[in-house]
């Protein structure tokens, strides 16, 4: 449900006839939150990315943070959903990670995973105090679940694809270990009474 993944959906919908938007059930709730906090989303994204003024966004919220043509999902799912499109099976899997509405997709005929933001070619964006809760423990488990599929092609939403089962396994388990370490260290510091500046 992040803007960088859905913001252009209106253009696809305008060019299609009868397209069906499928998403996790929390996506519509995220879109509603974007609408309710339109101005706030402009402000916090300006702080994080520093690009909204340059690109013509109005920080006062006159323009929509969620582009007005973005469709709500026509079909939703909770945990998993199998879709056959053009004779190809796509197995959608929900897991929490950078968002609570995240989907990763297994395409068995290609031994491929479409990973969305579960992988971004940088340390995972596991927390931002001005934004919605992130889920690093569940995120690590999702990466391990992907590795267990033994994919031969890995397609993240950002950055280059990865080919080769061994390479993909190494990448997925390395990022999972980093997230697990982050959680362990954070909990240890919290339980020891650490302050934000420690």
Outline where the language-model segments fall.
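Active-site HxH/HxHxD metal-binding segment of metal-dependent hydrolases
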Residues: 1-73
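Sec-exported extracytoplasmic/periplasmic mature domains
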Residues: 11-17, 144, 148, 191
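Gly/Pro-rich turn-and-neighbor structural signature
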Residues: 59-62, 66, 80-89
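Metallo-beta-lactamase
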Residues: 71, 82, 89-173, 177-182, ...
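C-terminal regulatory/interaction regions
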Residues: 187-198
């Amino acid at each position: 449900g992040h803007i960088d993944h859905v913001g252009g959906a209106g253009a696809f919908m305008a060019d299609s006839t009868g397209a069906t938007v499928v998403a996790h059930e929390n996506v519509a709730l995220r879109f509603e939150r974007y609408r309710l906090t339109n101005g706030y989303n402009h402000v916090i994204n300006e702080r994080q990315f520093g690009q909204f003024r340059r690109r013509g966004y109005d920080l006062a919220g006159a323009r929509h943070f969620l582009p007005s043509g973005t469709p709500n999902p026509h079909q939703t799912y909770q945990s998993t959903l199998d879709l056959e499109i053009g004779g190809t099976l796509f197995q959608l899997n929900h897991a929490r990670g950078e968002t609570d509405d995240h989907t990763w997709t297994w395409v068995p005929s290609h031994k491929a995973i479409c990973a969305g933001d579960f992988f971004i070619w940088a340390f995972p964006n596991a927390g931002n105090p001005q934004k919605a809760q992130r889920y690093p423990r569940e995120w690590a488990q999702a990466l391990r679940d992907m590795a267990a599929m033994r994919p031969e092609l890995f397609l993240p939403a950002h950055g280059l694809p990865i080919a080769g089962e061994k390479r993909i396994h190494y990448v997925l388990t390395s990022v999972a270990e980093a997230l697990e370490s982050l959680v362990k260290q954070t909990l240890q510091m919290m339980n020891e009474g650490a302050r934000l500046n420690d």
